[in-house]
Amino acid sequence: YKGVDLIIIRENTEGLYSGVENEVTPGVVMSMKVASKEACQRIATWAFRFANRRERKKITVLHKANIMKLTDGLFLKCASDVHANDYPNLAFESTIIDAGCMKLVQDPSQFDVLLLENLYGDVISDLCAGLVGGLGVVPGANIGQDLSIFEAVHGSAPDIAGQNLATPLALLLSSVMLLNFF
């Protein structure tokens, strides 16, 4: 695709990546999806503030609230509330993630800013990287309340080491994001 201009905002402290797992009985394991109102409101507020400052037009929450009514429902409700109460000037939509994936690969231009919980954000960020050439050309950042880290996402590529194939573009674009952040 040419001209894809997406921003992906991912809550990355909760969800299934919280690491709350246990073995219920031999051969049966369980992971717990964690969602707190505080974290959901924090990322929604940050996303809308960021989109507004960058003069973006629309935020889309991709979710599975039709199935995960409590966790994804809370995430969606917090985003909807932040929109209604603080940023009604921005367009807002919610889309079931399955349909959102299909729409993304069919026509990514219909999206502007994507707001996702942790696992979905991990998967969708890779999908979107594929739309523009792969992980090697996509910048990344982890924005905290006190500290931020700007990085080329997904680490190293030892499989192409020494072959003169790697591109520093993701690192350079992440550096540009860092400089624009301050």
Model feature map: region roles:
Residues 2-5, 13, 54-57, 87-90, ...:
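Short coil/turn connectors at secondary-structure junctions
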Residues 23-27, 75-82, 132-141, 145:
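A glycine- and small-aliphatic-rich helix-loop capping segment at beta-alpha/alpha-beta transitions
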Residues 25-98, 110-113:
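Glycine-rich phosphate/diphosphate-binding loop of Rossmann-like nucleotide-binding domains
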Residues 18-22, 70-75, 104-107, 127-128:
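Short acidic, glycine/serine/threonine-rich loops at helix termini
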Residues 1-38:
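Flexible glycine-/small-residue-enriched beta->alpha junction loops
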Residues 7-11, 62, 116-118:
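Short beta-strand segments
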Residues 104-182:
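Glycine-rich phosphate/nucleotide-binding loop
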Residues 5-6, 13-14, 22, 45, ...:
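Non-catalytic beta/alpha edge segments that cap or flank active sites
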